[in-house]
Design a protein with these regions (language model features):
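Rossmann-like S-adenosyl-L-methionine
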Residues: 194-276
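Class I Rossmann-like S-adenosyl-L-methionine
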Residues: 1-222
Length: 276
């Protein structure tokens, strides 16, 4: 078994099976499996790329398998997603992508190895553009949803908000770009400039007063300030939400605030640190 590919599969499976957060589960999997350096970078791209492209990958897997993806055993389905991403999005040879994925499926569901081999070989017969041309719906919005791996309702919402499908597709393209890793220097415990100066390939964020961006990549869990609790991983946009709320002028009313992007508590934790 290839450790990097196995780590990526485990992270993808955890997201779909357990509603796990990839940014939380993947670093733990990499550490526990001893995957580091270039192998960790490969596993990271494979994990996040597979998750970003799941909608399109599922359409291609379903066509190659001649069945809906919800009729494929979940472990096999996730392995096929990981294999298909390598075939269609990464500079990985078809033989390596197929062979390693079949080995993975054999370790998960031995009886499904032949099925996986057939599906992946069928996928490898065309590149991504070829598959999109073959599967493209007539409806422009549905076609954009397939091309950009977004649900149709999101594409329609973008069109409504931006006024045209062309503008919406630019936003969808941007939404699929791999985001940089941001750290949040916890107020009162660490200055962002000091954190950035202590790390190679790091810079103070552009917008949040607490942000540091890891421009050189790497495992944020290995950062001493993250390990000792003076910083944590948090997207700069999420930090801005907390900063905006912390600076909001409140009148005498008992206002209620609704977080429509609630997760594991990053914004709430930052608000607590600001309030101390």
């Amino acid at each position: 078994m290839d450790p990097a590919r196995e780590a990526a599969y485990e992270a993808v499976a955890a997201v779909h099976r357990d509603d796990a957060y990839a940014n939380l589960v993947l670093p733990r999997i990499l550490r526990e499996s001893g995957v580091s350096g270039r192998d960790a970078a490969f596993a990271t791209e494979l994990t996040y790329g597979t998750l970003r492209q799941t909608g399109t990958l599922d359409a291609i897997v379903a066509a190659a398998a001649d069945r809906p993806v919800d009729r494929i055993d979940p472990p096999v389905r996730d392995a096929l997603r990981v294999g298909a991403y390598q075939l269609l999005h990464m500079r990985v040879g078809a033989h390596a992508a197929v062979a390693t994925t079949v080995d993975l499926v054999r370790s998960l569901v031995p009886g499904a190895a032949g099925f996986a081999n057939a599906v992946l070989r069928r996928i490898a017969e065309a590149d991504r553009s070829g598959w999109l041309a073959r599967l493209a719906p007539a409806d422009p919005v549905a076609r954009a949803a397939l091309t950009h791996a977004h649900p149709e309702w999101i594409v329609r919402a973008f069109v409504d908000a931006l006024g045209s499908l062309d503008e919406a597709e630019l936003a969808l393209d941007a939404d699929n770009l791999p985001p940089p890793v941001h750290l949040c220097a916890r107020p009162g415990l660490l200055d962002p400039a000091d954190l950035a100066a202590a790390l190679a390939g790091a810079a103070v964020g552009r917008y949040s007063p607490y942000a540091v961006v890891l421009t050189g990549g790497g495992d944020p869990g290995a950062v001493p300030a993250v390990r000792d609790g003076r910083a944590h991983v948090q997207d700069e946009g999420s930090q801005l939400v907390a900063a905006a709320l912390a600076g909001a002028l409140l009148d005498a009313r008992d206002d209620t605030w609704l977080d429509l992007c609630a997760g594991p508590g990053g914004k709430a934790g930052l608000l607590g640190a600001v309030a101390v």
